[in-house]
């Protein structure tokens, strides 16, 4: 497509969009090696994120004995633990956008290496200095959050560059299991490594003994040093195995590996489908995080007689619902099999399943209703985790590596933004529930009513998300263009295309002399072709 073209007919743009999305190049064999290396470091990093829940039943009493009783900490221990976990999400939101810029400057491999190093430093800092003070503990959790946030953007970018449209959804969906796999692994390993606490009824009293305190400290450190070691090993594997596709070897996908001006990505993001995808994903994260927060207590309150003697069962059932992101490759595989004009259906169905999950889970009157709730929760997770993140490079990939990185960085902001929004709402509901009856002007309301309020809030939230999922459907012009046989394509694989902006197409966002290369290249010597 000529760089001198300032305005193009919208039909020409739709045709190029159709050519990009309908292209099915063969995927290079080494792409699967690159995916493995990226996935390995990516599942190691969330282990640092979830380094605390597996030891929470021991860590919180330790915090009480070490900081609350001596008067060194005035925060409620449960709230203090929550801040340690939420620090990751808040930090990830802050670093997501700069990460897109960093990828544009140095590329995905160096950026992911930096992410791994920062996470390892944060985790090692926790292991070494967590007992100094709560503020020190929190500071190293923030450092860990920087690494997690960078990985959430860089990992799928590194994978997307290797895979063609034919396999990209499943490949990115495989990468998207990074959090469920890392979370499940460390949440099962941590209790085993801290099993010395088994059979101790009074944990706080146990920890009042200085000798026992030292034992507890060493056990926490064992878990956290293990996580640090796993990150380091995975990082070495990534450094050795991952590389960018080589055009000389014929390793070409539809997405160009050129790193362009940061602003060149923005026209590709001003797109109805992208906006619908972002909002639907944020509201899905809101509801899913609410499930994680409230489900166990809700289930126990609804059916207390069912869990006598099997207190672990509610938590196990909730784990099944929230860890089912491991099955995300199924959603990616289904998306790969669908025509490009039908891929949006997976996102819509996923949101609709979450809507049904809320309906069945809201004040259920029989346990079989919970079965339906759990089913729709799992199906919704599988479909959305397996399709939303891969959809970003599919929608903005014509802008090359830079557009993909920026798009995924914005998706990360919306993802963690949904979780933080849920935290605000839950705090607001909890504060309202804790008010004195005289302060709210009516008779005392049982706590279960406020628990139901949480579920009532989720219903309109996911309904709105389902409506926005409809916006990911291709336009009528694109659907019509996909039906008609096209002549020889103007767009070529790996080419940076001209962005769509309403009914007109603005001037191409970059010129040849704006392409970032490893060595200094004069503008007059820059190649005319972008492939």
Question: Can you annotate each of these PLM segments?
Answer:
Residues 8-14, 200-209, 241-263, 478-490:
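Flexible cytoplasmic inter-helical loops of multi-pass small-molecule transporters
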Residues 52-57, 271-322, 326-329, 422-423:
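Extracytoplasmic gate region of multi-pass secondary transporters
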Residues 94-108, 328-340:
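Helix-to-loop junctions at the C-terminal end of transmembrane segments
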Residues 105-116, 336-350:
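Cytoplasmic membrane-interface "Motif A"-like loop-to-helix N-cap segments
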Residues 140-178:
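Cytoplasmic helix-loop-helix junction between adjacent transmembrane helices
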Residues 165, 174-243:
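Helix-loop-helix hairpin linking two adjacent transmembrane segments in secondary transporters
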Residues 341-388:
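C-terminal transmembrane helical hairpin of 12-TM major facilitator-type secondary transporters
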Residues 396-435:
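A late C-terminal transmembrane helix in Major Facilitator Superfamily
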């Amino acid at each position: 497509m000529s760089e001198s073209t300032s305005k193009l007919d919208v039909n020409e743009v739709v045709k190029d969009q159709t050519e990009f999305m309908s292209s099915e190049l063969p995927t290079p064999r080494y792409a699967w090696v690159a995916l493995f290396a990226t996935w390995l470091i990516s599942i190691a990093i969330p282990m640092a994120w979830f380094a605390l829940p597996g030891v929470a039943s021991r860590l919180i009493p330790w915090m009480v004995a070490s900081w609350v009783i001596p008067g060194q900490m005035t925060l409620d221990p449960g709230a203090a633990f929550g801040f340690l976990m939420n620090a990751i999400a808040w930090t990830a939101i802050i670093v997501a956008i700069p990460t897109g810029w960093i990828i544009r400057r140095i590329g995905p491999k160096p950026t992911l290496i930096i992410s791994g190093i920062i996470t390892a430093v944060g985790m090692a800092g926790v292991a070494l200095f967590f007992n100094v003070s709560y503020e020190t503990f929190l500071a190293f959790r923030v450092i860990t959050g920087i690494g997690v946030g960078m990985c959430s953007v860089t990992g799928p970018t590194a994978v997307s560059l290797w895979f063609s449209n034919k396999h990209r959804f499943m490949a990115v969906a495989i990468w998207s299991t990074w959090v469920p796999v890392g979370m499940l692994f460390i949440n099962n390993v941590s209790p085993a490594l801290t099993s010395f606490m088994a059979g101790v009824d009074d944990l706080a009293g146990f920890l009042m003994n200085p000798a026992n305190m030292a034992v507890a400290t060493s056990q926490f450190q064992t878990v956290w040093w293990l996580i640090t070691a796993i990150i380091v090993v995975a990082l070495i594997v990534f450094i050795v195995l991952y590389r960018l596709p080589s055009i000389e070897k014929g390793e070409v996908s539809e997405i160009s590996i050129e790193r362009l001006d940061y602003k060149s990505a923005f026209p590709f993001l001003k797109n109805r489908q992208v906006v619908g995808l972002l909002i639907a994903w944020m509201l899905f994260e809101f509801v899913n995080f609410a499930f994680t927060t409230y489900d166990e207590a809700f289930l126990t309150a609804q059916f207390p007689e069912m869990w006598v003697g099997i207190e672990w069962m509610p938590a196990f059932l909730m784990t099944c619902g929230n860890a089912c992101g491991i099955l995300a490759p199924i959603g990616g595989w289904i998306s790969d099999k669908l025509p490009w004009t039908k891929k949006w259906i997976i996102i819509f169905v996923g949101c609709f399943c979450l809507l049904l999950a809320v309906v069945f889970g809201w004040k259920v009157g029989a346990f079989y209703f919970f079965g339906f709730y759990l089913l729709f929760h799992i199906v919704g997770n599988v479909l959305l985790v397996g399709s939303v993140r891969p959809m970003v490079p599919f929608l903005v990939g014509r802008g090359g590596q830079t557009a993909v990185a920026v798009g995924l960085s914005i998706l990360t902001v919306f993802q963690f933004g949904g979780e933080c929004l849920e935290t605000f709402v839950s705090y607001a509901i909890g504060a309202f529930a804790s008010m004195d009856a005289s302060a709210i002007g009516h008779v005392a309301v049982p706590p279960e009513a406020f628990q139901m309020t949480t579920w009532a809030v989720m219903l309109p939230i996911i309904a709105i998300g389902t409506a926005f999922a409809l916006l990911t459907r291709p336009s009528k012009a694109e659907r019509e263009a996909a039906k008609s046989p096209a002549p020889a394509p103007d767009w070529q694989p790996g080419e940076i295309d001209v962005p769509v902006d309403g009914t007109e197409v603005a001037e191409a966002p970059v010129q040849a002399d704006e392409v970032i290369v490893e060595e200094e290249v004069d503008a007059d010597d820059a190649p005319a072709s972008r492939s």
